[in-house]
Amino acid sequence: MSEVRQEYKMHSLPAVFLMEATLSDEMVNDLNEYLDDLLNQEDRVSHAGTLVGQIGNGEQLTMDHNHPKLGKFNELIQIMGADYVKNFAGSTVNPFKENRVVETDELWSVHSYAGDYNPIHDHGTKTLMGISCTCWTKVPQQILDQPTSGT
């Protein structure tokens, strides 16, 4: 698990630790190719039963985190997840004596379009230390056209 490298930032908020990263173009392209293929598959599996938002124009699909196109992405989120846990523990309780291993349990996509709504929410996890993340691979032009914060 040592070939994937990514710069990221840790944001400490009063009751939250927020991690942020910008993925490489290669990784985003691999994700988008996988997702485009997934959308075209007749046997795609809907993940909509767990949906919090109102996605009427798009879909929520189960992704195979072991798929070759997702290998680097899956490895990266596991590395970042382990680092997140390490930073959280070191800042809130006693630091761990050993690094934790993070494994991907579920991965899904939310394909949203105009009129769809997916509010900020949290996810239940199968373990006490379960974590989740969000990744945007395509951003609507009207969002990109907005002024950048702080400028």
Each predicted region: which residue ranges?
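Catalytic core of non-heme Fe(II) oxygenases with the double-stranded beta-helix
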Residues: 106-151
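Non-heme Fe(II)/2-oxoglutarate
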Residues: 1-96, 115-118
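A short coil-to-beta-strand element that immediately follows conserved catalytic motifs
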Residues: 91-107
